[in-house]
Amino acid sequence: MSEMTPREIVSELDKHIIGQDAAKRSVAIALRNRWRRMQLNEELRHEVTPKNILMIGPTGVGKTEIARRLAKLANAPFIKVEATKFTEVGYVGKEVDSIIRDLTDAAIKMVRMQSIDKNRYRAEELAEERVLDVLIPPAKNNWGQAEQPQEPSAARQAFRKKLREGQLDDKEIEIDLAAAPMGVEIMSPPGMEEMTSQLQSMFQNLGGQKQKPRKLKIKDAMKLLIEEEAAKLVNPEELKQEAIDAVEQHGIVFIDEIDKICKRGGNSSGPDVSREGVQRDLLPLVEGCTVSTKHGMVKTDHILFIASGAFQVASPSDLIPELQGRLPIRVELKALTTHDFERILTEPNASITVQYKALMATEGVNIEFTEDGIKRIAQAAWQVNETTENIGARRLHTVLERLVEDISYDASEMNGQTVIIDAEYVSKHLDVLVADEDLSRFIL
């Protein structure tokens, strides 16, 4: 898990997300508290429960982006889900328990990659020996079995040197590689994951672990052999246990669009399959329960839950009281201003303007955004948000795409040219659309 301090986490988020300091501080503290808890003695560690977070703010202000960037920083099992995808138990649709199953699968993948990286040096040595065995087959005894010489021959050592220096990379060899397992996808009813897993294993193991000869360049063969040898060095049972432990102690679940499962005012007939029912099903997960997965039982007592929603129609008080109580930290994200839009266009690493410049540079076209051009783009996006639906920073993508549409279309014929996007250029291409509310509604 990450050992970054809250200040370091916020600093890293600042590289990609403009403003929203309160939200950044909250997630940074929550992430650091995961590390702090692990420094306590076992008895006290068990008593410290995570302080779950509810992020409230209009669409397009950075809620989902914070989650996306946090996933990369956490170095822990992390999953982002949409609350609207789930239905109450007993109805057609995904159950909320599948969140923990997916989180466990993510942890298995993460721990496997870490184990493979840990064993990579040994795997490279074994892969190298297999390639050398093909290039210089070892002598065989009377029974046709390969003999292991006391010391490597001079020829083998010479080939090893060439192999490490990359002189043999383009030479083709035929080598035996493990055949890909038979892919069998089985749709299982809820609660039957273990049986499904066993059936899949049975089908995959039909005929045993076959090896298939393949003709490859040495550099490609080495990559596949390293993966194969590294996988052999990983203990599946230890891997499962380590992954389950990582989920239970460090797991983070981000639930987006939680406002869409609030019970809205007014009388509604029929069962509330995907709203209040889902909240009731979420409650045990957030409070702490045990979920059965194909890898084993997973306790959710110390998993951190971060929920977010726009709450434009509903309000946080429309969530069921028990769920409100389990999301004690409330953070409000502010609507973006024109100044924020200007910063979004220029400050983040790989900002939208940098992306467009890089895309056009592949065709030999140089795009330059002037300061007044950036200001005019920001004003246009903000103005359209005010007069139509406010979709936050996402409006910048729409405006910029419209702005560079002609350049994108003609780029292949503009090799070597420079296009200056200043206030005049922006006004020429966008003013008519921005001024006409009907056109803005349908085009921008």
UniProtKB/Swiss-Prot annotation:
Family assignment from sequence similarity: Belongs to the ClpX chaperone family. HslU subfamily.
Entries under HAMAP family matching the protein: HslU
Keywords, ordered alphabetically: ATP-binding, Chaperone, Cytoplasm, Nucleotide-binding, Stress response
InterPro entries, per database record: AAA+_ATPase (IPR003593), ATP-dep_Clp_protease_ClpX (IPR050052), ATPase_AAA_core (IPR003959), Clp_ATPase_C (IPR019489), HslU (IPR004491), P-loop_NTPase (IPR027417)
Function (record text): ATPase subunit of a proteasome-like degradation complex; this subunit has chaperone activity. The binding of ATP and its subsequent hydrolysis by HslU are essential for unfolding of protein substrates subsequently hydrolyzed by HslV. HslU recognizes the N-terminal part of its protein substrates and unfolds these before they are guided to HslV for hydrolysis.
Matching Pfam families: AAA, AAA_2
Gene3D superfamilies per the UniProt record, alphabetical: 1.10.8.60, DNA helicase RuvA subunit, C-terminal domain (1.10.8.10), P-loop containing nucleotide triphosphate hydrolases (3.40.50.300)
Ligand binding (ATP): I18, G60, V61, G62, K63, T64, E65, D256, E322, R394
GO cellular component: HslUV protease complex
GO BP terms: protein unfolding; proteolysis involved in protein catabolic process
Stored SUPFAM superfamilies: P-loop containing nucleoside triphosphate hydrolases
Record's subunit section: A double ring-shaped homohexamer of HslV is capped on each side by a ring-shaped HslU homohexamer. The assembly of the HslU/HslV complex is dependent on binding of ATP.
Subcellular location field: Cytoplasm
Domain of life: Bacteria
Entry keyword annotation includes Nucleotide-binding: yes
Gene Ontology molecular function: ATP binding; ATP hydrolysis activity; peptidase activity; proteasome-activating activity
Name of the featured protein: ATP-dependent protease ATPase subunit HslU
